[in-house]
Amino acid sequence: MTHSKRWLEEHEKDPYVKRAKKEGYPSRAAYKLLEIHQKYKLFKPSMNVIDLGAAPGGWSQVAKDLVGPKGVVIAIDLLPMQSMLDVIFIQGDFNEPEIFNQLEAIVAKKTLTGQVDLVISDMAPNISGIKNVDQSRSLHLVELAWDCAQKLLARGGTFLVKVFQGPGVDRFLINLRPYFNQVKFLKPSASRSRSSEIYILAGEFLGYNQRV
């Protein structure tokens, strides 16, 4: 059986996939974020959130439900995403200056401080099937997400990002820790057991110029 056929079979049998269809979420990824929120209380009413790599929208939908009508959710992705009520969507690469400037302008317009309370990223690279290549690409996306968070995350804010376990992750953690009071690894039960994906949860941002 090819990798693609095996994935399709697993996908069709996956209880989280079935649950997402039943409950109206665009993807099973919503349950990873819900589980993390239930344990760590990421979201509060009226929070301002950036969702990087948001398509197809599972995390954005969860975020908007939890921050409520007075909160702001800005979603960004290279891929198109179905329109969601009260979610601002930017299609493009946030690493490109023009797109980042657009993101920054929206944050400035929609928030009092020009910063957000929470930056979340469930980004994953296009999977090649070559483990070390995919892991390296995943880590690169994490570094891009962190670059964005440095510029737009408010002091006291939270950064949540997915990464594939492997070389370079420990080094990234060493570089990240001085900027946050709390940093931990998470593996939600909705993550497939054979997947190398984990989540880095960094809380109580000290500010980018605040090095310990």
Curated annotation (Swiss-Prot):
It catalyses: uridine(2552) in 23S rRNA + S-adenosyl-L-methionine = 2'-O-methyluridine(2552) in 23S rRNA + S-adenosyl-L-homocysteine + H(+). The active site is at K162. S-adenosyl-L-methionine binds at G57, W59, D77, D93, D122. GO terms for molecular function: rRNA (uridine-2'-O-)-methyltransferase activity. SUPFAM superfamilies: S-adenosyl-L-methionine-dependent methyltransferases (SSF53335). It is found in: Cytoplasm. Belongs to the class I-like SAM-binding methyltransferase superfamily. RNA methyltransferase RlmE family. Its main location: cytoplasm. One of its GO terms (cellular component) is cytoplasm. Pfam families: FtsJ (PF01728). It comes from Coxiella burnetii (strain RSA 493 / Nine Mile phase I). Its EC number is 2.1.1.166. This is Ribosomal RNA large subunit methyltransferase E. InterPro entries: RNA_methyltr_RlmE (IPR050082), RNA_MeTrfase_FtsJ_dom (IPR002877), rRNA-MeTfrase_E (IPR015507), SAM-dependent_MTases_sf (IPR029063). It comes from the Bacteria. The gene is rlmE. One of its GO terms (biological process) is RNA methylation. Keywords: Cytoplasm, Methyltransferase, rRNA processing, S-adenosyl-L-methionine, Transferase.
